[in-house]
């Protein structure tokens, strides 16, 4: 297929790069050049594909989801606390089968696309995500989840799952997800670290989500004793670092309860912290300290988590929650939902920005005009609904969001 120039009224390539009357050269599913003026478009001499009065942006990147848990939407209230919620999740999930999980992933992928998300970091414990994601649809980093709850009898099975994880495919990238330092034994965590070093695949791990986690990790105390048998006797971040997993290829999900100096350690290591605003609100947690993380120099990303702890899979809502709760600049919030997410899933330069060499994963939003400040304000307030979503330059949704 010959190169084409995709034009629109305005293009937000990334925060700080705004184009009026220009366009993007697309070829082979990627952005081959950014044309910053009508004159540059004319000089390109290529076939034009004009989207009209729209604002063109990169697709949003959902850095943390559990699409398979769509089977539990609205079924698990948080009233009795986090550990009780986990117990209910385990019991409820046991009643679902492969078809249920596959259906949940497919429906979840459609919901993400409808809200302008074109790439997701999806934690997969059932194998369902690999059957649905990619292949010209939603782009996905599929994190294959393992845990053994400190039970050596389960470690071998978890290691086998890691060694037998499928290869990536079109629009699908494989990753590793040791569930959390409190549910993964030192042996299994070390194996994940070794595998990440050898494969270069991205890693996602839940960390510091609740105070109960720290109580269990360090002292073997608290409600986690109902679920687990052996406390590691160390802080979670120390366990992650000892396994070789504290680095640029790792996403630390939640990060709500930290000790002095841990933010700086994470910044030096280059790991990404993923905040899930909807889940945070679901459990009624204290405000997430965005500014402390930003001042420490940590890369931040946003995720929806699952429908078991959120009422939607809409990154527009997640951005709006951050705006309402933290009072951050719209450009910073947009960066978390695009550039930050791309770093989290290990696809920086390929998704999350409209730059030369990136995949042409684009969203067109209705736009009557205005500058970048107005655009970022509207985008991060959740005021706009996509009119078209493209993956690798091919329309997937038009006018039905």
Feature locations, PLM:
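Alpha-helical scaffold segments that flank or form the walls of functional sites
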Residues: 55-56, 73-136, 159-168
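Histidine/acidic residue-rich metal-binding segments in metalloenzymes
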Residues: 131-134, 158-272, 284-300, 349-352
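His/Asp/Glu-enriched, well-ordered alpha-helical/loop segment
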Residues: 242-245, 286-368, 387
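C-terminal cap of metal-dependent C-N hydrolases
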Residues: 359-401
């Amino acid at each position: 297929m010959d190169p084409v120039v995709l034009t629109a009224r305005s293009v937000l390539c990334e925060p700080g790069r705004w184009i009026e009357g220009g366009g993007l050269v697309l070829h082979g599913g990627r952005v081959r050049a950014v044309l910053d003026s009508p004159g540059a478009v004319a000089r390109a001499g290529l076939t034009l594909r004009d989207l009209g009065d729209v604002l063109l942006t990169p697709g949003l990147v959902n850095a943390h989801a559990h699409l398979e848990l769509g089977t539990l939407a609205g079924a698990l209230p948080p009233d009795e606390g986090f550990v009780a919620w986990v117990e209910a999740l385990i019991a409820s999930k046991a009643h679902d089968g492969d078809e249920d999980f596959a259906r949940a992933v497919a429906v979840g992928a459609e919901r993400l696309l409808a809200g302008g998300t074109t790439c997701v970091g999806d934690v997969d414990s059932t194998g369902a995500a690999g059957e649905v994601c990619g292949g010209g649809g939603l782009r996905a980093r599929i994190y294959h989840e393992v845990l053994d709850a400190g039970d050596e009898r389960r470690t071998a099975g978890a290691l086998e799952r890691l060694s037998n994880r499928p290869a990536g495919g079109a629009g699908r990238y494989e990753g590793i997800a040791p569930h959390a330092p409190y549910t993964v034994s030192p042996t299994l965590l070390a194996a994940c670290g070794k595998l990440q070093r050898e494969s270069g695949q991205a890693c996602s791990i839940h960390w510091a989500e609740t105070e109960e986690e720290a109580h269990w990790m360090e002292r073997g105390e608290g409600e986690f004793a109902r679920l687990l048998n052996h406390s590691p006797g160390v802080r979670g971040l120390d366990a992650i670092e000892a396994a070789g997993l504290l680095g640029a290829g790792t996403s630390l999900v939640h990060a709500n309860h930290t000790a002095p100096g841990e933010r700086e350690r994470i910044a030096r290591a280059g790991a990404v912290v993923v905040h899930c605003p909807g889940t945070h609100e679901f459990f009624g947690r204290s405000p997430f300290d965005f500014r402390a993380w930003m001042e420490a120099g940590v890369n931040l990303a946003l995720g929806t988590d699952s429908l078991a702890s959120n009422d939607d899979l809409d990154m527009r809502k997640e951005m709006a929650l951050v705006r309402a709760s933290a009072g951050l600049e719209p450009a910073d919030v947009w960066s978390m939902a695009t550039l930050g997410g791309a770093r989290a899933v290990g696809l920086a330069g390929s998704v999350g920005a409209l730059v030369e060499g990136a995949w042409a994963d684009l969203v067109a939003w209705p736009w009557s005009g205005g500058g970048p400040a107005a655009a970022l304000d509207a985008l991060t307030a959740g005021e706009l609904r996509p009119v078209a979503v493209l993956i690798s330059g091919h329309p997937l949704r038009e006018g039905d969001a």
